[in-house]
């Protein structure tokens, strides 16, 4: 009798769980339009974890860089995680796009090494500049200025951006693992690092394993590749197991709302602000356009869906990040890894945000995600990103040359924004002197003029 009661209770509980799962899946499907985007909850979740794993390094690197500016590294760690959570949630729930956000590399270096250490200002001054940048971006987004800039980029260059980002991502992966290094003797720009032992060897093993998984069309190949690589790295001595699992996040009291207002009308503030605006705007635009192009998310007019919401999410993210106490928050190029795993909606971003939340309390565990582990995913994603080169018009040299400059300048200058600058400016010059000036839009000319002014007077 008791056994029958148990069976009935088990059956009832199972039905309740199944019903609950069905309701949840239906809600997620309706909210994020999963079926419409040819994806599902499992795919989005794996994509979100993959994105997190390829960008988790920011939790370690950002505090290290900003501590050089006199900021408490523990507080910056918490601010980095919190700003990434909030920013990525906004991108996922509001813009409903699979892009993750966190304090941007390059932007944090400018914050610490240029504004604070070189120019001699306090980190409070730098945080004030970041706050003003975010507020200006909010206004520019409301009045459709940033959206107009995105639309002004020629179609061929948009496709080239995806290819250039692919090469840059691959370079980041190879460099992080020590496969590609900067030689101390200065004989060459880059050289081959140590690939017979340590991180370099582990990264190569990871690339081969991930490549096999991709070739065999294994679902979640990038995620599984990193997981297997991390396990192999333990006996190799490259990946260290943590001494503890749980740790409470440090306080952000020393960085929260730390602003300095008495220098906001100085010439230096104008220069710093313009540089931040320029770097963040075109890094973000390049990432959104490049990754969306690879994911076939562009509409028939070549526009990114919900681009205004995505740009607004980016602007809010920078503002929130400044209040918490970190440098400019931007859309991460590593979002391409999640897209490569099939992520197509905001549920991917929500999953990434959840992983950042876990990282707040489980930071020792996430310490095993070393550059040698993530290199495999970044290199393979680089391959995926360059596939759009097949769609670039190489017959018309006024289209092909700007596209080529966009592609090669991203990895060579280590900058997405600089690649876009070379592409757009050369596009206008070639069209103008080839007698094709009618193909140039006025907005594109204005954007190019801003590029030139920036490089003449600031860089």
Model-assigned labels for residue ranges:
Residues 25-62, 83, 104-113, 117-162, ...:
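Helix-loop-helix junctions within the multi-pass membrane cores of secondary transporters/permeases
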Residues 64-75, 115-125, 269-270, 370, ...:
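Helix-coil boundary and interhelical linker segments in multi-pass alpha-helical membrane proteins
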Residues 3-23:
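Short, Lys/Arg-enriched N-terminal segments with co-localized hydrophobic residues
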Residues 119-231, 235, 350-459:
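Membrane-embedded alpha-helical modules
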Residues 85-105, 136:
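Juxtamembrane transmembrane-helix boundary signature
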Residues 24-75, 190-192, 224-308, 449-453:
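Helix-loop-helix hairpins and the membrane-proximal interhelical loops
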Residues 69-89:
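Loop-to-helix transition at the N-terminal end of transmembrane alpha-helices
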